[in-house]
């Protein structure tokens, strides 16, 4: 994956990017060393108890004035066990979805402010 990312960056003419493989709860980078962090359907795969640590790590490595873009599926209410325990839905980033209020709390506790949310799908993909 790293090799492909480096290849794509090079073919796109990007010289100020780097990629590492690491645990999202313990990122081996210095404090305040990253300009921008992009996460696409990753945090949903982190166990619920570790999600606050993810946002603390993001805040730790982000430079002052840096930016974070996260794309994840969020739930409006608690997911039932039939969804949470479905491995296919876990792999599809659905079963690990946090509630919107939980996400906001994780971000605020990590010190983030000025957050903007874009809700791209207002309808539930699951019947009530």
How should each PLM-predicted stretch be described?
Residues 25-37:
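A short acidic, Gly/Pro-enriched loop at the edge of an enzyme's catalytic core
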Residues 111-128:
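Conserved catalytic loop of SAM-dependent methyltransferase domains
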């Amino acid at each position: 994956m790293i090799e492909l990312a480096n290849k794509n960056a090079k073919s796109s003419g990007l010289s100020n990017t780097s990629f590492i493989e690491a645990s999202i709860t313990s990122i081996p980078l210095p404090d305040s060393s990253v300009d921008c962090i992009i996460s696409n359907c990753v945090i949903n795969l982190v166990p619920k108890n570790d999600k606050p640590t993810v946002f603390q790590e993001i805040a730790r490595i982000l430079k002052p004035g840096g930016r974070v873009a996260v794309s994840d599926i969020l739930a409006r209410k608690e997911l039932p066990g039939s969804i949470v325990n479905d491995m296919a839905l876990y792999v599809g980033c659905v079963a690990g979805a946090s509630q919107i209020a939980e996400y906001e709390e994780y971000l605020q506790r990590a010190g983030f402010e000025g957050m903007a949310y874009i809700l791209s799908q207002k309808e539930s993909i699951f019947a009530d």
